[in-house]
Protein backbone atom coordinates (compact mmCIF):
# COMPACT_ATOMS: atom_id res chain seq x y z
CA UNK A 1 0.00 0.00 0.00
CA UNK A 2 1.46 3.35 -1.02
CA UNK A 3 1.40 6.47 1.10
CA UNK A 4 -1.69 8.00 -0.60
CA UNK A 5 -3.72 4.84 -0.06
CA UNK A 6 -2.65 4.75 3.59
CA UNK A 7 -3.68 8.39 4.08
CA UNK A 8 -7.06 7.78 2.40
CA UNK A 9 -7.67 4.73 4.53
CA UNK A 10 -6.84 6.76 7.62
CA UNK A 11 -9.34 9.47 6.68
CA UNK A 12 -12.02 6.85 6.08
CA UNK A 13 -11.35 5.33 9.47
CA UNK A 14 -11.61 8.73 11.12
CA UNK A 15 -14.91 9.51 9.36
CA UNK A 16 -16.53 6.28 10.38
CA UNK A 17 -19.11 7.02 13.11
CA UNK A 18 -18.59 5.52 16.51
CA UNK A 19 -20.43 2.23 16.75
CA UNK A 20 -23.84 2.59 18.38
CA UNK A 21 -23.73 6.37 18.73
CA UNK A 22 -26.62 7.04 16.32
CA UNK A 23 -28.89 4.35 17.74
CA UNK A 24 -28.12 5.51 21.28
CA UNK A 25 -29.14 9.06 20.33
CA UNK A 26 -32.40 7.84 18.79
CA UNK A 27 -33.11 5.75 21.87
CA UNK A 28 -32.50 8.75 24.13
CA UNK A 29 -34.87 10.88 22.04
CA UNK A 30 -37.57 8.21 22.24
CA UNK A 31 -37.12 7.90 26.00
CA UNK A 32 -37.33 11.68 26.36
CA UNK A 33 -40.59 11.77 24.38
CA UNK A 34 -42.09 9.02 26.55
CA UNK A 35 -40.98 10.82 29.71
CA UNK A 36 -42.44 14.10 28.45
CA UNK A 37 -45.77 12.41 27.74
CA UNK A 38 -45.79 10.85 31.20
CA UNK A 39 -45.03 14.21 32.83
CA UNK A 40 -47.79 15.86 30.81
CA UNK A 41 -50.30 13.25 31.97
CA UNK A 42 -49.09 13.62 35.55
CA UNK A 43 -49.48 17.40 35.41
CA UNK A 44 -53.04 17.03 34.14
CA UNK A 45 -53.81 14.57 36.92
CA UNK A 46 -52.34 16.86 39.58
CA UNK A 47 -54.15 19.88 38.14
CA UNK A 48 -57.44 18.03 38.59
CA UNK A 49 -56.73 17.94 42.31
CA UNK A 50 -55.73 21.57 42.83
CA UNK A 51 -58.04 24.49 43.60
CA UNK A 52 -58.41 27.23 41.02
CA UNK A 53 -58.23 30.95 41.71
CA UNK A 54 -61.80 31.68 40.68
CA UNK A 55 -63.34 28.68 42.43
CA UNK A 56 -61.13 27.89 45.41
CA UNK A 57 -63.15 24.91 46.60
CA UNK A 58 -63.57 23.37 43.16
CA UNK A 59 -61.03 22.01 40.72
CA UNK A 60 -60.61 22.00 36.97
CA UNK A 61 -62.89 23.54 34.38
CA UNK A 62 -64.83 22.42 31.37
CA UNK A 63 -64.83 24.52 28.24
CA UNK A 64 -68.20 25.62 26.97
CA UNK A 65 -69.49 24.29 23.69
CA UNK A 66 -68.57 26.38 20.63
CA UNK A 67 -70.82 29.44 20.43
CA UNK A 68 -71.97 29.09 24.05
CA UNK A 69 -71.23 30.84 27.33
CA UNK A 70 -72.66 30.49 30.83
CA UNK A 71 -74.43 32.38 33.59
CA UNK A 72 -73.98 31.40 37.24
CA UNK A 73 -76.39 31.92 40.10
CA UNK A 74 -75.86 31.05 43.76
CA UNK A 75 -78.47 29.47 46.02
CA UNK A 76 -78.24 29.21 49.80
CA UNK A 77 -80.91 26.85 51.10
CA UNK A 78 -82.56 27.99 54.33
CA UNK A 79 -82.88 25.67 57.30
CA UNK A 80 -84.37 22.35 56.20
CA UNK A 81 -85.73 19.92 58.78
CA UNK A 82 -84.55 16.33 58.82
CA UNK A 83 -86.28 14.40 56.05
CA UNK A 84 -87.68 17.59 54.52
CA UNK A 85 -87.26 19.45 51.22
CA UNK A 86 -86.40 22.80 49.62
CA UNK A 87 -87.09 24.06 46.11
CA UNK A 88 -86.10 27.20 44.22
CA UNK A 89 -86.90 28.19 40.64
CA UNK A 90 -84.08 29.21 38.32
CA UNK A 91 -84.43 32.98 38.12
CA UNK A 92 -81.70 34.50 35.97
CA UNK A 93 -80.60 38.16 36.07
CA UNK A 94 -82.50 40.65 33.90
CA UNK A 95 -79.34 41.24 31.86
CA UNK A 96 -79.60 37.60 30.75
CA UNK A 97 -83.37 37.12 30.48
CA UNK A 98 -83.56 39.88 27.87
CA UNK A 99 -82.00 37.27 25.56
CA UNK A 100 -84.86 34.88 26.32
CA UNK A 101 -84.70 33.07 22.95
CA UNK A 102 -81.07 32.02 23.33
CA UNK A 103 -80.92 28.23 23.58
CA UNK A 104 -79.78 26.52 26.77
CA UNK A 105 -77.63 23.41 26.39
CA UNK A 106 -76.77 22.37 29.94
CA UNK A 107 -77.49 23.13 33.58
CA UNK A 108 -74.84 22.25 36.12
CA UNK A 109 -75.15 22.20 39.91
CA UNK A 110 -72.02 22.39 42.06
CA UNK A 111 -72.34 21.67 45.76
CA UNK A 112 -70.12 23.76 48.03
CA UNK A 113 -70.20 22.62 51.67
CA UNK A 114 -69.50 25.23 54.32
CA UNK A 115 -67.46 24.36 57.42
CA UNK A 116 -70.40 23.18 59.54
CA UNK A 117 -71.69 20.70 56.96
CA UNK A 118 -71.51 17.07 58.14
CA UNK A 119 -74.65 15.53 56.68
CA UNK A 120 -76.14 14.09 53.47
CA UNK A 121 -78.30 15.90 50.92
CA UNK A 122 -79.90 14.89 47.63
CA UNK A 123 -79.90 17.51 44.87
CA UNK A 124 -81.57 17.60 41.45
CA UNK A 125 -82.94 19.98 38.81
CA UNK A 126 -86.46 19.47 37.45
CA UNK A 127 -88.92 21.08 35.10
CA UNK A 128 -91.94 22.02 37.19
CA UNK A 129 -95.41 23.28 36.38
CA UNK A 130 -95.96 27.02 36.52
CA UNK A 131 -98.75 26.38 39.02
CA UNK A 132 -96.52 24.39 41.37
CA UNK A 133 -95.89 26.03 44.72
CA UNK A 134 -92.89 23.76 45.34
CA UNK A 135 -94.48 22.46 48.50
CA UNK A 136 -92.84 19.67 50.50
CA UNK A 137 -95.36 17.17 49.13
CA UNK A 138 -94.75 18.23 45.52
CA UNK A 139 -90.96 18.09 45.84
CA UNK A 140 -91.12 14.73 47.63
CA UNK A 141 -93.11 13.28 44.73
CA UNK A 142 -90.55 14.56 42.21
CA UNK A 143 -87.68 12.92 44.07
CA UNK A 144 -89.63 9.67 44.30
CA UNK A 145 -90.64 9.30 40.63
CA UNK A 146 -87.11 8.60 39.39
CA UNK A 147 -87.58 10.87 36.36
CA UNK A 148 -84.40 12.89 36.84
CA UNK A 149 -80.81 12.24 37.96
CA UNK A 150 -80.06 12.92 41.61
CA UNK A 151 -76.74 13.92 43.12
CA UNK A 152 -76.24 12.39 46.56
CA UNK A 153 -73.80 14.63 48.37
CA UNK A 154 -72.48 13.63 51.77
CA UNK A 155 -69.96 14.85 54.26
CA UNK A 156 -66.33 14.36 53.25
CA UNK A 157 -63.47 14.76 55.70
CA UNK A 158 -61.44 16.49 52.99
CA UNK A 159 -64.12 19.18 52.68
CA UNK A 160 -65.39 18.41 49.15
CA UNK A 161 -66.40 14.97 47.94
CA UNK A 162 -65.11 13.96 44.51
CA UNK A 163 -68.49 13.90 42.76
CA UNK A 164 -69.75 17.29 43.90
CA UNK A 165 -71.57 18.24 40.70
CA UNK A 166 -74.57 17.29 38.62
CA UNK A 167 -74.69 18.10 34.89
CA UNK A 168 -78.05 17.96 33.07
CA UNK A 169 -78.15 18.12 29.26
CA UNK A 170 -81.15 20.09 27.96
CA UNK A 171 -80.03 20.40 24.33
CA UNK A 172 -82.49 17.75 23.09
CA UNK A 173 -85.38 19.70 24.63
CA UNK A 174 -84.50 22.89 22.72
CA UNK A 175 -84.94 24.80 25.98
CA UNK A 176 -84.15 28.51 25.92
CA UNK A 177 -83.32 31.13 28.53
CA UNK A 178 -86.98 32.08 28.79
CA UNK A 179 -87.78 28.48 29.79
CA UNK A 180 -85.46 28.51 32.79
CA UNK A 181 -88.14 29.88 35.09
CA UNK A 182 -89.93 26.56 34.50
CA UNK A 183 -87.03 24.69 36.12
CA UNK A 184 -86.22 24.40 39.81
CA UNK A 185 -83.37 23.20 41.99
CA UNK A 186 -84.61 20.72 44.58
CA UNK A 187 -82.86 19.67 47.79
CA UNK A 188 -83.69 16.82 50.18
CA UNK A 189 -82.02 16.80 53.60
CA UNK A 190 -82.00 13.09 54.29
CA UNK A 191 -80.44 12.44 57.69
CA UNK A 192 -80.24 15.68 59.64
CA UNK A 193 -81.61 19.19 59.84
CA UNK A 194 -79.70 21.42 57.41
CA UNK A 195 -78.83 24.82 58.81
CA UNK A 196 -78.73 27.97 56.69
CA UNK A 197 -74.96 28.27 57.01
CA UNK A 198 -74.11 24.74 55.91
CA UNK A 199 -74.44 24.59 52.13
CA UNK A 200 -74.15 26.71 48.99
CA UNK A 201 -75.32 25.60 45.54
CA UNK A 202 -73.68 27.13 42.47
CA UNK A 203 -75.86 26.73 39.38
CA UNK A 204 -74.26 27.25 35.96
CA UNK A 205 -76.58 27.65 32.96
CA UNK A 206 -74.78 27.13 29.65
CA UNK A 207 -76.53 29.03 26.86
CA UNK A 208 -75.88 30.56 23.46
CA UNK A 209 -73.37 33.34 23.68
CA UNK A 210 -74.12 36.71 25.16
CA UNK A 211 -71.35 39.03 26.48
CA UNK A 212 -70.08 37.05 29.51
CA UNK A 213 -67.41 34.43 30.18
CA UNK A 214 -66.51 31.37 28.12
CA UNK A 215 -65.40 28.74 30.65
CA UNK A 216 -67.88 26.59 32.56
CA UNK A 217 -66.65 25.94 36.12
CA UNK A 218 -66.75 22.33 37.28
UniProtKB/Swiss-Prot annotation:
Transmembrane portions of the chain: none
Annotated signal sequence is: none
List cellular component terms (GO).
ribonucleoprotein complex; T=3 icosahedral viral capsid; viral nucleocapsid
Enumerate composition-biased segments (Low complexity): 1-10
GO MF annotations for this entry? RNA binding; structural molecule activity
For region Disordered, the annotated ranges are 1-30
Looking at the Swiss-Prot or TrEMBL record, what is one Pfam family this protein matches?
Cucumo_coat
The record's note on its domains: The N-terminal arginine-rich stretch does not seem to be the major RNA-binding region that allows formation of an infectious ribonucleoprotein complex.
Indicate what this protein is called per its UniProt record: Capsid protein
Amino acid sequence: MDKSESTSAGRNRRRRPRRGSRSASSSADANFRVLSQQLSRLNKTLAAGRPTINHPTFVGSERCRPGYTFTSITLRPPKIDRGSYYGKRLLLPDSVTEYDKKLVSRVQIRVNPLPKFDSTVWVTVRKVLASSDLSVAAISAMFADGASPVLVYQYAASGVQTNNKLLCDLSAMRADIGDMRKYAILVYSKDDALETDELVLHVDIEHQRIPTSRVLPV
